[in-house]
Every structure is written in C-alpha cells, then in structure tokens.
Amino acid sequence: MSKRESAKYKIDRRLGENIWGRPKSPVNKREYGPGQHGQRRKGKLSDFGLQLRAKQKLKGHYGDVSEKQFRKVYEEADRRKGDTSENLIGLLESRLDAVVYRAKFVPTIFAARQFVNHGHVNVNGKRVNIGSYRCKPGDVIEVREKSKQLVIVLESVGLAERDVPDYIEADHNKMVATFSRIPGLADVPFAVQMEPNLVVEFYSR
C-alpha cells in the first residue's frame, strides 16, 4: 500500500471501522486500532464517548471535514425546521464533493474534494472549485470535457463496490449527474451505522 493510500485509511484505523466499505481497508483484517496497544480490549464508552465517536465517524466519512466547518453545518441544521439530525445529513450530502463522490465520478471522498478544487467540475454549466459548495435539487453536475478521460474517472465508474444512490441521477457515458433531491439518513448508502442523533446530543451539551 502506498503512502498516499495509507494516509486515506488513517480514519478507518483510528476508528476501527471500514467507514467507506472499501475492500482494501486495513480494518478488514483486524478488529483493533493501530499501534502497540491496539489489541487491548476497549472499555465501554460513556455517553460523551459515544457522542464524540459518532461525530468523528460522520466528519471522517465526508473527508475529515474541519471542526469549524462541521460545526457551522450543524448550526445551520439546527436552525432549520424539522429534525436536526436529518437536516445535518441532508446538508452534508448536498456538498459538491459528496455529490461527485456519490455519482462515482471519482473513487473516494478525498479524491472528490481534490477533483473539485482542481476545477474539473461544472455545476449548471459553470465551473465550481469549492468542495463545500451547496448543491440544490435540480442542479446538474458535469465533469468538464477535458477531464472526462482522466484515469481516475474511468476507473471509478467501473467500481463494483458501491452504487449510485437514487437521489442522484448519473449518466456515466456523458459524465453528468443531477442532484434530484435532498436525502435523509435512510437514503444514504453508508457502509457503517451513522448516528447523527448522537452528534446533535454532542453539540447540545
């Protein structure tokens, strides 16, 4: 495994879970964390520990979003009408880098952020290079013409390990996707259980 690949698995190793469902994740081979003390049996987590872990998993899944940025998303979710935990998932899934990842234009959420930042993506015909850009239902996301033959794109489309969720309509021949609607927790194909309700409890302390 290259240094670059190893770095991408550090979140899996830290949490002891394969949070993206990737076949090469090191936690597929062991059920303990890294380091010389990794094999020690983990004690029962406190309520705070469970809340913190839920936050770390959700942040990690979206590419280790910074605490400042993640809290900002939470605060917006809390201001909106409805269930805060469902709002939180909807806002995170509306990020442009998340949509690019879910559409299978690239293989990982980290690659999606870099892909967007490097200007390979148009939204409604205009280049957008901000991974946290908020997509709205009906937005059309397209890989720019010169980027459609990049190896990372061609390899990702053929990945069998994940499917495109039904709130995104993707045409891999044209490399175009439409963000159809804002999803809820039950709609998102998380590889492990996510508990946004515990994240809400963490920030509500």
Swiss-Prot record:
Any Gene Ontology biological process: ribosomal small subunit biogenesis
Q: Where is this region: Disordered?
A: 17-46
Source species, domain of life: Bacteria
User: What GO cellular-component annotations does this UniProt entry give?
Assistant: small ribosomal subunit
S4 RNA-binding domain boundaries: 94-157
Q: Which UniProt keywords apply?
A: Ribonucleoprotein, Ribosomal protein, RNA-binding, rRNA-binding
**What GO annotations for molecular function exist for this entry?**
rRNA binding; structural constituent of ribosome
Give the protein's biological function.
Answer: One of the primary rRNA binding proteins, it binds directly to 16S rRNA where it nucleates assembly of the body of the 30S subunit.
Which PANTHER family does this entry report, sorted A to Z?
30S 40S RIBOSOMAL PROTEIN, SMALL RIBOSOMAL SUBUNIT PROTEIN US4M
Subunit details for this protein? Part of the 30S ribosomal subunit. Contacts protein S5. The interaction surface between S4 and S5 is involved in control of translational fidelity.
Indicate the family of this protein. Answer: Belongs to the universal ribosomal protein uS4 family.
Xref: NCBIfam families: PRK05327.1, rpsD_bact
Q: What is this protein called?
A: Small ribosomal subunit protein uS4
The organism of origin for this protein? Mesorhizobium japonicum (strain LMG 29417 / CECT 9101 / MAFF 303099) (Mesorhizobium loti (strain MAFF 303099))
Its lineage opens with: Bacteria, Pseudomonadati, Pseudomonadota, Alphaproteobacteria, Hyphomicrobiales
